[in-house]
Amino acid sequence: MTDTESLVVSSDPKHPANLIVELCKLFYDNNWVTGTGGGISIREGDTVWLAPSGVQKERMQPTDMFVMDLKSRDYLRRSPTFKPSACTPLFLSAYTLRDAGACIHTHSQAAVMCTLLYDKVFKISNIEQIKAIPQVVESGYLSFFDTLEIPIIENTAHEEDLTDTLQAAIKEYPTCTAVLVRRHGIYVWGETVWKAKVYNEAIDYLLELAVKMIQMGIDPEGGIGSEKQGKFFRGLQG
């Protein structure tokens, strides 16, 4: 085995290349990364593993991975089959600006729908699942009564062209752990790959819930009891 192959071939199920394969299959089953869309990257120190472009996520193999040095931005290992992901500069933005250990990009339908329903920022409050989201600037997690805010940036024709606006959103919203891209999807990051996974799952739950609340005429940011003003509740009262 060559030195470069040893970067992606391992019997350890916790090896980044193996984890990316496992998680991409899981995200495919959740309908988040269909049609070769989306991606994931994991960082350990200055070494970054990246899912490639154009791969069917449920069929990905560890040997399909790219490996990069974070400081030099040089590839330590290239996929023999696929091209580098256009998401790469956005993943690197989460590493350099937030010291993240992993970054996930999905084309979640709930994420896309929320970008059509909200203007500049997605907001939701008074929902239990919010407690899974970190405060980022301060230690700990958001509380039930806190408001989760996720900035929304405009899509571009080419993924890499999102880099500047994504970086600007990260800087403008220092407490965010995700950025939505209008009519496109979402980027979510975390201190470790498992935390990024949890944040992504919790956020997607909240995005889907917000869409359903709006359909029922309920304000996702409304206070407790505001649901009684929704059209569905009023219809039940006859």
Swiss-Prot record:
Under the cellular component aspect of Gene Ontology, which terms does the record hold? cytoplasm
The record lists the catalysed reaction(s) as: 5-(methylsulfanyl)-D-ribulose 1-phosphate = 5-methylsulfanyl-2,3-dioxopentyl phosphate + H2O
Tell me the GO BP annotations in alphabetical order: L-methionine salvage from methylthioadenosine
Q: Which cofactor does it need?
A: Zn(2+)
Active site (UniProt): E128
* Location in the cell: Cytoplasm
Quote the InterPro entries the UniProt record gives.
Answer: Aldolase_II/adducin_N (IPR001303), Aldolase_II/adducin_N_sf (IPR036409), MethylthioRu-1-P_deHdtase_MtnB (IPR017714), Salvage_MtnB_euk (IPR027514)
| Positions annotated to bind substrate | C87
Has UniProt tagged this entry with the keyword Ribonucleoprotein?
Answer: no
Record carries keyword Phosphoprotein: no
Q: Could you tell me which Pfam families the record lists for this protein?
A: Aldolase_II (PF00596)
Metabolic or biological pathway:
Amino-acid biosynthesis; L-methionine biosynthesis via salvage pathway; L-methionine from S-methyl-5-thio-alpha-D-ribose 1-phosphate: step 2/6
UniProt binding sites for Zn(2+) = H105, H107, H184
Query: Which keywords appear in this protein's UniProt record, sorted alphabetically?
Result: Amino-acid biosynthesis, Cytoplasm, Lyase, Metal-binding, Methionine biosynthesis, Zinc
List the Gene Ontology MF annotations in alphabetical order: methylthioribulose 1-phosphate dehydratase activity; zinc ion binding
Q: What disulfide bonds does the UniProt entry report for this chain?
A: none
Cofactor binding annotation: Binds 1 zinc ion per subunit.
Documented EC number(s): 4.2.1.109
Q: Which PANTHER family match?
A: METHYLTHIORIBULOSE-1-PHOSPHATE DEHYDRATASE
What function does this protein fulfil? Catalyzes the dehydration of methylthioribulose-1-phosphate (MTRu-1-P) into 2,3-diketo-5-methylthiopentyl-1-phosphate (DK-MTP-1-P).
Q: Which family does it belong to?
A: Belongs to the aldolase class II family. MtnB subfamily.
Name the chain's protein.
Methylthioribulose-1-phosphate dehydratase
Q: Which organism is it from?
A: Yarrowia lipolytica (strain CLIB 122 / E 150)
Instruction: Recall the taxonomic lineage recorded for the source organism.
Output: Eukaryota, Fungi, Dikarya, Ascomycota, Saccharomycotina
Q: Which gene encodes it?
A: MDE1
